[in-house]
Swiss-Prot record:
Similarity annotation: Belongs to the universal ribosomal protein uL4 family.
Any one GO molecular-function label of the UniProt entry: rRNA binding
GO BP, sorted A to Z: translation
Gene3D superfamilies according to UniProt: 3.40.1370.10
InterPro entries registered for this protein in UniProt: Ribosomal_uL4, Ribosomal_uL4-like, Ribosomal_uL4_dom_sf
Annotated keywords: Ribonucleoprotein, Ribosomal protein, RNA-binding, rRNA-binding
Membrane-spanning intervals of the chain: none
Protein name (database record): Large ribosomal subunit protein uL4
Region (Disordered): 45-66
Superkingdom of the source species: Bacteria
Length: 201
């Protein structure tokens, strides 16, 4: 199959298995959820009644005071007491094998092509790391919400886009399922497309 390049009259020959496969929603959902879960810190921690300092002595005798019986001032029903089902640090990551991950990326790329959200250009860059220059270039292409994917890290592009809302710059190694679906359009250089094909082959 062919992908028409926006800044050239030629078209780029690409693999049908990478850019023309059927959309597998269940697989994409599973991989995106796993990716997001892996980004969680999982460092939340609370103290149970046995971990809160103090509370070893019975506050008052069992009977004869007229008050409700109490065995510890660190009971979960007391102020400053422990937490009944205290949250503990945990690993939220989910296992996703390489085949599934690659399949999800292929599925997303194919869907981007179908929805005409993938824009391929011969080259994309700016002469200086100026946000104004990048905004002008994107305005020219009528792009506001876009992920720019280049073959290698472009320092000028990265610095210019750093302060822009809804604009991100990644190299091929930095793409992931979440970033590919998070933006309205995905702008890729021809070299980046070739590298992605090799990576997913």
């Amino acid at each position: 199959m062919e992908l028409v390049m926006k800044d050239a009259k030629s078209a780029l020959e690409v693999s049908e298995t990478t850019f023309g496969r059927e959309f597998n929603e269940a697989l994409v959902h599973q991989v995106v959820v796993a990716y997001a879960a892996g980004a969680r810190q999982g460092t939340r921690a609370q103290l149970t009644r046995s971990e809160v300092s103090g509370g070893g002595k019975k506050p008052w005798r069992q009977k004869g005071t007229g008050r409700a019986r109490a065995g510890s001032i660190r009971s979960p029903i007391w102020r400053s007491g422990g937490v009944t089902f205290a949250a503990k640090p945990q690993d939220h990551s989910q296992k996703v094998n390489k085949k599934m991950y690659r399949g999800a990326i292929r599925s997303i790329l194919s869907e981007l092509v179908r929805q005409e959200r993938l824009i391929v250009v011969e080259k994309f860059g700016i002469e200086a790391p100026k946000t104004k220059e990048l905004i002008a270039k994107l305005k020219e292409m009528e792009l506001t919400d876009v992920l720019i994917v280049t073959a290698e890290v472009d320092e000028n592009l990265f610095l210019a886009a750093r302060n822009l809302y809804k604009v991100d710059v990644r190299d091929v190694a930095g793409i992931d399922p979440v970033s590919l679906i998070a933006f309205d359009k995905v702008l890729m250089t021809a070299e980046a497309v070739k590298q992605i094909e090799e990576m997913l082959a």
